[in-house]
Amino acid sequence: MGKEIQLKPKANVSSYVHFLLNYRNKFKEQQPNTYVGFKEFSRKCSEKWRSISKHEKAKYEALAKLDKARYQEEMMNYVGKRKKRRKRDPQEPRRPPSSFLLFCQDHYAQLKRENPNWSVVQVAKATGKMWSTATDLEKHPYEQRVALLRAKYFEELELYRKQCNARKKYRMSARNRCRGKRVRQS
């Protein structure tokens, strides 16, 4: 009669989660009236997981592989909504970076030279601290650059939108000409 609502397939779980579910069921059978807090139970499970043999872990890994195959097969047949990313027009102007990002660009090389073994995350944290401790006077040049970049961006965006509208009008008039209709020029 009506459309059937197709539910999204249940996600696959790891071998450790399969072990957890099995261990939980065994624990409930052995001690049905005992309550164990989540933290304590998790600790027991992780200790047990580390102590079991590779042969036993292989059983759970096989279950996880089967579950993954099931999930992938169900996703192939799933017709529900999937998010599609909007394709970005390469001619569309890009938004200007923030004053903080300009600050990061200026200080990244310096921090990397001073600390060559730092990861990108560590450098980012350091620049974040530098920015938060910087005074308004130190931030002012970056904010001025951002203001200039923003003004330029909005000019380019306005020009881009005008060009897009002109292209749309041209396409519409061309389509109508192909159909033999006359288009009023305004």
UniProtKB/Swiss-Prot annotation:
SS bond list: none
Any GO molecular function: DNA binding, bending
DNA-binding region: 9-79, 93-161
Native source species: Homo sapiens
Protein's gene: HMGB4
Annotated spans, Disordered: 77-98
Family named by the database record: Belongs to the HMGB family.
Chief subcellular location: nucleus
Superkingdom in the source lineage: Eukaryota
Subcellular location: Nucleus; Chromosome
UniProt protein name: High mobility group protein B4
PANTHER family: HIGH MOBILITY GROUP PROTEIN B4 (PTHR48112:SF7), HIGH MOBILITY GROUP PROTEIN DSP1 (PTHR48112)
